[in-house]
């Protein structure tokens, strides 16, 4: 006799088989999920990379939570566990309030000290316990739950009040590591072994340019950003009023996709994250492209850059993580996505984005490019603009391999020289034959 659980399971079988038939990659994913191991992670790690994955356990019978930290390098793996108390969540709340809710004219010495202490406290909880396990230069962070909204490169590695008088002098983790992120450690199996040759950029800017990125009007700073980027790398910009289908077609191009547009993590209706395709004052009246619509696409882009507000933010589901626009692009097949944790001031966003493409063009890994331009930004800015709000929002998630091939100028010069010598030899040979 069949019980109710078996009956329910059997009733789903036809739908599951239909999904497997319509989406054959699902079978590959199921198989990979079952067979994936620590050894595979180690094999896929590149030179000087370490993967650090976090897991916050549910409340134990005693009411306590624990933070598990898994560290995997090429040669070894380690696990560390520590209790989670209310202080940890208070520090995370302080970081969120001071970065996601940054207001320049409200900055005080008290807020500076509070944020500094919180960034150090989270470092002590998340990185310091396992730091002795890796001497690697590159960290791949796989965050869990609320840790997904933490900019790890802005964490402070030591607290010395006498030497840290402003944000410019803070010992950020950024100064020691190139940091990237992954939603799941299994995604490391999908990293590209080589760079694309010379990919072009397709940048999309809806409407005209008359307002800032922080308001729901047209985009002004984003246009200048795209113009500067296209002076560095080949590509095109599309700036006109378009409907959803126009954008969907662009998203399926085999190019680096740069989207400088408005987005919302949610709204008063509780909607899922979406892009705003029109330049209107009220986003609820705008033409929208939702995260679940992006999920259904099949992307061919080597990288998606979301130069928009809060593209890494969304609803948090326990056991699943944050459902964001960035995650939707990963699920649609993008190997890597650059996203933001909070709305960024126009001029600083432009500076970091343009610098990022400049470094990418040199053929270096994406995480190294983004980290390098952030360090350069901190070196060049006056103290107030070194507040993490201005530079720490942007993160690279997924594959970190170079997107542009590095030009070997010695090889090019050598090839030209050899070609010239061959040409000169045959020219001289033909001259003597005529004589």
Task: For every predicted segment, state its role.
Residues 54-55, 142-145, 177, 182-184, ...:
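Active-site-proximal beta-strand/loop segments in catalytic clefts of secreted hydrolases
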Residues 28, 33-38, 111-114, 216-271, ...:
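Functional beta-strand-loop-alpha-helix junction segments that form "active/interaction loops"
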Residues 3, 7-14, 18, 25, ...:
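Peri-functional-center coupling elements
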Residues 7, 195-197, 348-435:
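An often Trp-containing, charged/polar helix-loop segment at the C-terminal end
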Residues 19-54, 60:
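Coiled-coil termination/hinge junctions
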Residues 183, 190, 255-351:
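Catalytic cores of nucleophile-dependent amide-cleaving enzymes
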Residues 52, 69, 139-141, 204, ...:
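Residue-level detector of buried hydrophobic side-chain packing
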Residues 147-156:
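A short acidic (Asp/Glu
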